[in-house]
Swiss-Prot record:
GO molecular function, one term: type II site-specific deoxyribonuclease activity
Protein name, as recorded: Type II restriction enzyme and methyltransferase RM.Eco57I
Naturally occurring in which organism (per UniProt): Escherichia coli
Protein activity control: Mg(2+) is absolutely required for DNA restriction.
Alphabetical list of Pfam families matching this protein: Eco57I
Reaction(s) the record says it catalyses: Endonucleolytic cleavage of DNA to give specific double-stranded fragments with terminal 5'-phosphates; a 2'-deoxyadenosine in DNA + S-adenosyl-L-methionine = an N(6)-methyl-2'-deoxyadenosine in DNA + S-adenosyl-L-homocysteine + H(+)
Length: 998
């Protein structure tokens, strides 16, 4: 029987006894069993888990039919439909005697469920009518029943509209990703404004109100204490309010206190809650002083937690949503300005930095590849004796999810082995008994964070998670109900131990923590991303310790490098690690030591790359999932996500996978994408590396004076062997012999540096060096004073700056009068040549320009300029090499091996340049030599055409530009034939398209 026939039979059944079904005798539980279960089975949903999926991946969660005590305000949705473990929509059932097409309360209820859970839609049905509601809008008491209602189907329409309904809420729609596409407009509304934004705004309003009141009670409160007090009170009130909606406390208890401003009853309630729940949640200071005030803000805060002032349904306010809110909450703090005004401002480490929360589906994927994998084949005893941690836990998103997954794993274990540990919720659904959940939390879950308020938020989230699904009956009579988690959620610096020679005066700011005393079976998380320069600004004393302590603290390392290394140190043998990270460590030079550490120890088991897909909301970060095992792996898996939305549905065809031998990795850049590897192999098979052609020493960085302000100047005039310039408002002149032409980038960023335009010096650099034979020598103090008196005089003027202890000169000076040496002496001989290529290191293409003026340039890490010299004995023309470097092939190569920076720039340092593949020419073969000479001549002509374009009037300029473009097309064709990549050529974007998509 096909699905439409099954549905028609169900409709006929309803019609045949419609008066009975509409009567008060027929209840909601009967409706669910007789009709709604059947309707959604027809729509493809596995209502009873007949497929035997593990608990954490059940398609449908079904609530108990009629809870004895649950009122409309404290019950959960009757059905939760999921994509694996992600909630997609709720179904709320009403008996047919409730006309959901006209009655407002059920509509408001299902919308509040969906809004609180950040769902796109939810469904309301009594079978006679089935309604689909948009859940992106705030719910107001004055809303009509039709407000936000997208669809309303009468039962007689179900067969005719079956295909449409199946497309909207059918199982196949959800599991193919069509559901998300169908409701994408609603998703966009949620991204712009959702429960997170609303609740965070409310919490911040409460913070200001409470802070002002506490300062009235005790005006000398320090900021840290004030923040702790405010957070403790908000946690306490929100906790009790959540417990009311979860049927753990009498509904509206707090509301009645607020209405009556009954401070004695509220104080009594808070103190009794301290005894009942313990765990430090209700250890509140200044209770009597705050609550005895009839005008206290606490009363309005409480009222705002109830409908209609509150849109939320706390029975479905999930821990991950609350965690996201707290993650942003933790990035700011209450501050008192110099005028005594209370404000909320970013913490120092978050100033000018976006706060991002890890998407729940990413958290779940990491848990699935670590916690679930670790627990496979283990008994309950083995699992309960294991330790799972996040050592930069923040508000606890990862360990809260780990806690849930461990519960689900043990439910499946006990269904097979010991049902006495379980409580049956409905015919096919079980939960762990409360004492087992409590045991998991106390024995298995650990979190560490350097932010004290983060540990409090994490504890709060875990305790709410512990109480999820509980009622007064299931938690029992024993008190205190909640465990103290002060030995599980720990306040300290995960990266620094007490033995790391921390000075006594820095103990409180650094907060060393002996994490090596702990050993974990699984570590998960999203560790802090912080560049070396930011660490130097915010935590310079910690930075010094990192450099001494960690192998991965190399060059311009990122803080997350250290977290990977630290996690491996404290991971047990055969333990699992799962992190979401920027993928820069795979390729940047600073990641060299980390790559060596991982490859030599063969820890890598799996790497999932998201490519250019942006995982974090409103944040441009190229990310990957890194999975390590503390055991030797001969092979590892690499996955490329081609379609992120399809990846979420686990459709393998949208995930390219490769298996590599671990021995193929070393400290060098990891290039793992199969198609990229295929292209690179083909390119290198026809080419030779630039460094091998010209010699690696001829690919060099520019000069580094370490004091450009005093060495580099704009020329006013040049006469009689002297060059005139202005410094600090005074005109000077020095011997021109000890200067060199210099090119510097204009501050406006318009540096006029372009492949097709020869370098034109725009300033000069003081050059206290001379050439003796083939060597460059520093001009000693006495010789300088004697032969170059004007430069000597000027250097005396700036001596105080050049001789500054903070200025680094390498190699170290051996005498007292070397203070005017450059900071580094590399590249001097490379700059001072008749003709060379100058390369813009950080660029978005077309930054390989020819210099004919012996121009000097500066370099600095991933910015500035570098130099390529073509020795006389090399047969390749400088113009041939310029043409190849400018091509789309080498720009693409730079994007693979170079660093990608914000603003769509790629840094191609000398390490990348030396490896660039230059198509090989057999100069003894006349045809090949002709190709070389044609490309060389055409590049010269392109440079000339561009120069004419710049100098011409508008009429001629149009013609020159047209010629230039035609010649450029011909050049592209010539170089395409040189590389001869066949069908793979289309995989390499043009230079312009490459940077559009970065």
């Amino acid at each position: 029987m096909n699905k439409k026939d099954q549905l028609q039979r169900l409709i006929d059944k309803y019609k045949s006894d419609i008066d009975y079904y509409r009567s008060a005798r027929y209840n909601e539980t009967q409706l669910r069993t007789d009709f709604l279960d059947q309707l959604f089975l027809i729509l493809g949903w596995d209502i009873t888990n007949a497929a035997g999926k593990p608990t954490n991946e059940r398609e449908v969660l079904v609530e108990e039919g009629l809870k004895a005590r649950a009122g409309e305000n404290t019950k959960k949705p009757d059905y939760t439909f999921r994509l694996f473990s992600e909630r997609k929509f709720f179904l709320e059932a009403k008996k047919p005697s409730v006309d959901i097409s006209t009655t407002i309360e059920p509509a408001l209820q299902v919308r509040r469920y969906g809004f609180t859970a950040k769902l796109k839609i939810s469904v309301l049905s009594n079978f006679e009518y089935t309604a689909i509601y948009d859940c992106s809008n705030q719910v107001k008491e004055t809303d009509s029943v039709a407000n936000s209602r997208i669809k309303l189907y009468h039962f007689t329409e179900l067969v005719d509209k079956f295909d449409e309904i199946n497309n909207l809420i059918g199982r196949e729609s959800v599991y193919t990703g069509h559901f998300d596409n169908e409701w994408s407009e609603i998703e966009n509304k949620i991204l712009r404004f959702s429960v997170d934004d609303l609740f965070l705004k409310q919490i911040n309003d409460w913070r200001l109100l409470l802070a002002n009141e506490f300062l009235q009670i005790k005006n000398e409160l320090p900021e840290e204490k004030l923040n702790d007090l405010v957070q403790n009170y908000i946690n306490s009130i929100v906790f009790l309010r959540v417990c009311e909606d979860r049927d753990l406390e009498e509904y509206e208890t707090l509301y009645h206190f607020a209405q009556d401003k009954d401070f004695q009853s509220l104080v009594k309630k808070l103190k009794s809650s301290d005894k009942k729940y313990n765990s430090g949640l209700f250890s509140l200071e200044y209770i009597d002083e705050l609550l005895s005030n009839a005008n206290s803000c606490i009363w309005s805060i409480i009222e705002q937690l109830y409908f209609p002032q509150s849109t939320y349904s706390f029975s479905v306010f999930s821990s991950d949503i609350l965690g996201n809110i707290y993650e942003i909450f933790l990035s700011e703090k209450v501050r008192i300005d110099e005028l005594g005004n209370v404000k909320i401002q970013p913490k120092e480490e978050h100033i000018d930095r976006d706060v991002v929360t890890t998407p729940t589906h990413i958290v779940k994927e990491i848990i699935r590849n670590t916690v679930v994998e670790y627990c496979k084949g283990k008994s309950d005893i083995e699992i309960l004796n294991s330790k799972f941690a996040d050592i930069a836990c923040g508000s606890g998103a990862f360990i809260i999810e780990a806690f849930q997954f461990i519960q689900d794993i043990l439910i499946d274990y006990y269904i097979q082995n010991d049902k006495s540990k379980l409580q049956q919720i409905s015919e096919h659904t079980y939960k762990l008994k409360f004492e087992v959940k409590r045991e998991i939390l106390c024995k298995c879950i650990y979190g560490i964070d350097k932010d004290y308020n983060a540990t409090k938020a994490c504890t709060f989230g875990l305790l709410l998670k512990l109480l999820e699904g509980e009622t007064t009956e299931t938690i029992g009579k024993d008190t205190p109900i909640l465990p103290a988690l002060d030995t599980n959620i720990l306040f300290g610096n995960s990266l620094i131990d007490s033995g790391d020679k921390v000075k006594q005066e820095d103990i409180f700011s650094i907060n060393p923590f002996d994490l090596t005393n702990y050993q974990f079976d699984v570590i998960v998380g999203n560790p802090p991303y912080m560049a070396t320069e930011h660490m130097n600004q915010l935590t310079p004393k910690e930075l010094d310790i990192y450099k001494r302590k960690y192998k991965s603290a190399y060059k311009q390392f990122d803080k997350y490098f250290l977290f990977i290394e630290r996690s491996i140190q404290i991971l047990k043998e055969y333990g699992y690690l799962g992190y979401i990270l920027p993928s820069r460590f795979i390729k940047v030079d600073a990641g060299k030591k980390l790559r060596k550490f991982l490859s030599e120890n063969k820890y890598l088991s799996k790497l999932i790359s998201f490519g250019s897909h942006q995982v974090f909301k409103n944040k441009t970060t190229y990310t990957c999932l890194l999975f390590l095992n503390k055991e030797n792996h001969d092979n590892f898996s690499f996955y490329e996500v081609k379609d992120f939305k399809k990846w979420l549905t686990r459709e393998d065809k949208y995930l390219l996978s490769s298996t590599y031998q671990t021995s193929s990795l070393d400290s060098d850049t990891w290039v793992l994408e199969k198609k990229i590897n295929d292209i690179l192999k083909l390119m290198f098979s026809k080419s030779e590396q630039l460094g091998n052609i010209v010699g690696k020493s001829n690919v060099a960085n520019g000069i580094q004076t370490s004091a450009n302000k005093y060495y580099i100047h704009k020329e006013i005039k040049s006469e009689n062997g002297f060059i005139y310039f202005e410094y600090d408002g005074i005109e000077y002149h020095i011997e021109k012999e000890l200067t060199r032409p210099y090119f510097e980038t204009n501050r406006s960023g318009d540096d006029s540096f372009y492949t097709y335009k020869d370098v034109e010096p725009n300033s000069f650099v003081v050059y206290p060096y001379k050439k003796v034979g083939e060597r460059i020598q520093f001009i000693e103090y006495d010789e300088l004073k004697r032969q170059y008196p004007k430069l000597f005089e000027f250097l005396q003027v700036v001596k105080v700056h050049l001789n500054d202890k903070k200025r680094s000169i390498k190699p170290d000076p051996t005498g007292p009068n070397e203070w005017y040496r450059y900071g580094r002496s590399q590249a001097l001989e490379n700059c001072d040549v008749d003709q060379k290529l100058i390369v813009g290191i950080l660029s978005n293409g077309y930054k390989y320009s020819i210099d004919n003026h012996r121009t000097f340039v500066s370099s600095g890490g991933t910015a500035g300029y570098s130099i390529i010299n073509i020795p006389n004995n090399v047969r390749y023309s400088i113009y041939y090499i310029q043409a190849i470097l400018t091509s789309k092939y080498l720009e693409w190569f730079a994007s693979i091996y170079g660093d990608i920076f914000r603003g769509r720039f790629v840094a191609r340092g000398t390490k990348v340049q030396t490896r660039m593949p230059i198509p090989t020419i057999d100069f003894d073969d006349p045809k090949q030599k002709e190709i070389h000479d044609t490309i060389s001549s055409k590049q010269q002509y392109l440079n000339k055409l561009y120069s004419q374009t710049q100098k011409s009037a508008d009429r001629d300029k149009i013609i020159f530009e047209r010629q230039f473009e035609q010649e450029k097309i011909q050049m592209d064709y010539l170089i395409k034939n040189l590389f001869d990549l066949g069908d793979l050529d289309s995989e390499i974007p043009t230079v312009e398209d490459l940077y559009k998509n970065l």
